[in-house]
Amino acid sequence: MELHFLGTGAGVPAKKRNVSALAIRFLERNGTVWLFDCGEATQHQFLHSPLSLAAVEAIFITHLHGDHILGLPGLLSSRSFQGAETPLDIYGPKGLEAFVIQALETTKTKLRFPIRFHVLAEGRIRDEEKLSVDALALDHPVESYAFRIKEQDKPGTLDAEALKAMGVPPGPLYAQLKKGETVKLADGRIVNGSAFLDESIRGRTVVIAGDTAPVKAMEAFASGADVLVHEATFASNKKDDAHLYGHSTIADACALAKRAAVGQLILTHVSSRYARNENEYRDEAAALLPNVIIAEDLFVFELEKAGRKKRD
């Protein structure tokens, strides 16, 4: 699982930071991509990455401010122009569908692929065999959400040698036992599969928060996550301004990461006021949480299986 930070700035584009966009590429799913927010020029950032527009399967929009959605019509148009025909799911607050449809109709853009729009609400918004996505409402001047992407836990390794020693021959029964099921052998013996399984492998969890002032419910929502991607628009000396406009400071994000016991905090949505000199911003973050990462455009964070991680 790779997190590709395509845009890490706040409000307006800057020379080194484009506006908000983050893509997750699922290597175990043939490179399928989920995109979170789509600020202006996000499709340009795709050109500087190994990602393909055709691989985008779902788009999740945290809120309807322009720096998070103005790149969406162009990206959809280019995805179609490049020949993609697979359906696309788009999740976002009420009003997103109207924005997209109006932009496409005004520009006389016809897409090769169908779009399935989903209006966001708190709770489970996507449920697959191995992945789920939950949403949590945040605190911002417009409706804004955080997303929790969670893999299902995987069964532990089956102790085949112990089963063979018991006289249980390899075959279809092993598939049932690996699921932890109880099976009856031909000789009448009952075998409980869970007794022959190692501990299950915990699925990975990534939490991505949209623009927000501190929200108490985020602590439980992000609890134990392998990765928390959180905005830190301002340094902590701008706390009053941050909260007034529905944003967080470095200290807010770091405190949340500590309370929620997350494995890795990655800060994004950095105000352009720090463009000329980010040293103080970075120094504050490092002092509050030594392993914190401040994402830059095109930075890639790889979260390996079983929660192992590495950065590029």
Curated annotation (Swiss-Prot):
Gene3D superfamilies, per database record: Ribonuclease Z/Hydroxyacylglutathione hydrolase-like
EC number: 3.1.26.11
Residues at the catalytic site: 67
Family annotation (SMART domains): Lactamase_B
Any GO MF annotation of the entry: zinc ion binding
Positions that bind Zn(2+) 1: 63, 65, 140, 211
Cofactor(s) in the UniProt record: Zn(2+)
Top class in the EC scheme: hydrolase
Catalysed transformations (reactions): Endonucleolytic cleavage of RNA, removing extra 3' nucleotides from tRNA precursor, generating 3' termini of tRNAs. A 3'-hydroxy group is left at the tRNA terminus and a 5'-phosphoryl group is left at the trailer molecule
Superkingdom of origin: Bacteria
Sorted UniProt keywords: Endonuclease, Hydrolase, Metal-binding, Nuclease, tRNA processing, Zinc
Entry binding sites for Zn(2+) 2: 67-68, 211, 269
Comment on bound cofactor: Binds 2 Zn(2+) ions.
Family: Belongs to the RNase Z family.
Role of this protein: Zinc phosphodiesterase, which displays some tRNA 3'-processing endonuclease activity. Probably involved in tRNA maturation, by removing a 3'-trailer from precursor tRNA.
Subunit: Homodimer.
Record NCBIfam families: PRK00055.1-3, RNase_Z
Name by which UniProt lists this protein: Ribonuclease Z
The organism of origin for this protein: Shouchella clausii (strain KSM-K16)
Gene: rnz
